[in-house]
């Protein structure tokens, strides 16, 4: 089973969009709220090299943000990535 982690903030529209996309695909994920925990924000930056949210990881591989996740989904590559990692 794939491990999906998404770093978010409470008021981020792209974070909400990413979670809706994952929910629509019935994928389970762990959400880490970086607006409530500065150490988790630093962890996200260290792992992804980015400061923006959301940051999405599948099996510890950085996927990027909502635009990146959406592009993978539209191209069919998200399903392939998830199947490959099952």
Residue ranges and their predicted role:
Residues 28-40:
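Thiol-based oxidoreductase modules, predominantly thioredoxin-like and allied folds used
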Residues 48-57, 67:
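Structural micro-motif
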Residues 58-85:
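Non-catalytic, surface beta->alpha helical segment in thiol-disulfide oxidoreductase systems
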Residues 1-28:
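Local sequence-structure signature of Cys/Sec-based thiol-disulfide redox active-site neighborhoods
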Residues 13, 39, 64:
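Short alpha-helical
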Residues 1-8, 41, 75-76, 82-86:
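C-terminal alpha-helical interaction module
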